[in-house]
Amino acid sequence: MADSSKKLTVLLSGASGLTGSLAFKKLKERSDKFEVRGLVRSEASKQKLGGGDEIFIGDISDPKTLEPAMEGIDALIILTSAIPRMKPTEEFTAEMISGGRSEDVIDASFSGPMPEFYYDEGQYPEQVDWIGQKNQIDTAKKMGVKHIVLVGSMGGCDPDHFLNHMGNGNILIWKRKAEQYLADSGVPYTIIRAGGLDNKAGGVRELLVAKDDVLLPTENGFIARADVAEACVQALEIEEVKNKAFDLGSKPEGVGEATKDFKALFSQVTTPF
């Protein structure tokens, strides 16, 4: 367990994202345990989180801009990710998709013909999920950070996974490359490979850990963003999950018992990668 007499100073990158904002809120609510900072890439995103001094603006493609945010931190949670955007169609109008962000319309419960996707200039998976994450890992190591929690994705065992075909971005391939880089970095780490994300309430499902995408073909291959956020926060304090990597899914709501004991959950994880 972390030293309970000292607050952990934690930087969360991607703090204004759908999952990142949930994790940021959870950390802020536990001010007895954590001093939290957020890293975002624009003033608009900073204002979205309240605009306080604890919100830093940085560019993950430029390591020098990351150093002020990482000065003096104990831990880093990486929740940055390239975002595939949806091309408008008759079924999904531009108004519906709010500028084309796929996550606002399509989540793990979506079924139907998959529309076309693209990535914004400079925001391709290679740039964000590989180079951007590598820059964060390198800077954190340089600054003496003691623990990095990286949120990845299930599906990395299958090069032909449909997510890789979105915008021809090979997103899972680049994510897995960053995961391996972190595991080899020498910095204590926790890699959480989340299943299909949905926006339902957290704290109501039984969470499951596994490896090698075994949960993906089943109804247990999905998870609420709020539960991923909670797992990130819990991983900061549970020693047993350091230098471990695992898939994270959940049973359907109403099946099993809601997970409350994260130490018991994480004790099931045995794989370093």
Curated annotation (Swiss-Prot):
Family: Belongs to the NAD(P)-dependent epimerase/dehydratase family.
Binding site for substrate: 157-161, 175
Family annotation (CDD domains): SDR_a5
Known partners and oligomeric status: Monomer.
GO cellular component: chloroplast
Species the sequence originates in: Eschscholzia californica
SUPFAM superfamilies: NAD(P)-binding Rossmann-fold domains
Positions of the catalytic residues: 153
PANTHER family xrefs: NITROGEN METABOLIC REGULATION PROTEIN NMR-RELATED, OS05G0110300 PROTEIN
Nucleotide-binding listed as a keyword: no
pH-linked activity: Optimum pH is 6.5-7.5.
Keywords: Detoxification, NAD, NADP, Oxidoreductase
GO biological process, one term: response to toxic substance
InterPro entries found in the cross-reference section: NAD(P)-bd_dom, NAD(P)-bd_dom_sf, SARED1-like
Enzyme class name: oxidoreductase
Catalyzed reactions per annotation: dihydrosanguinarine + NADP(+) = sanguinarine + NADPH; dihydrosanguinarine + NAD(+) = sanguinarine + NADH; dihydrochelirubine + NAD(+) = chelirubine + NADH; dihydrochelirubine + NADP(+) = chelirubine + NADPH
GO molecular function: oxidoreductase activity
Protein name listed in UniProt: Sanguinarine reductase
Protein function: Catalyzes the reduction of benzophenanthridines, preferentially sanguinarine, to the corresponding dihydroalkaloids. Involved in detoxifying the phytoalexins produced by plant itself. The sanguinarine produced by intact cells upon elicitation, after excretion and binding to cell wall elements, is rapidly reabsorbed and reduced to the less toxic dihydrosanguinarine. Can work with both NAD(P) or NAD as a hydrogen donor, but at low concentrations, the reaction velocity with NAD(P)H is threefold higher than with NADH. However, chelerythrine shows maximum conversion rates with NADH.
Regulation: Inhibited by iodoacetamide and irreversibly by its product, dihydrosanguinarine.
Keyword Ribosomal protein in annotation: no
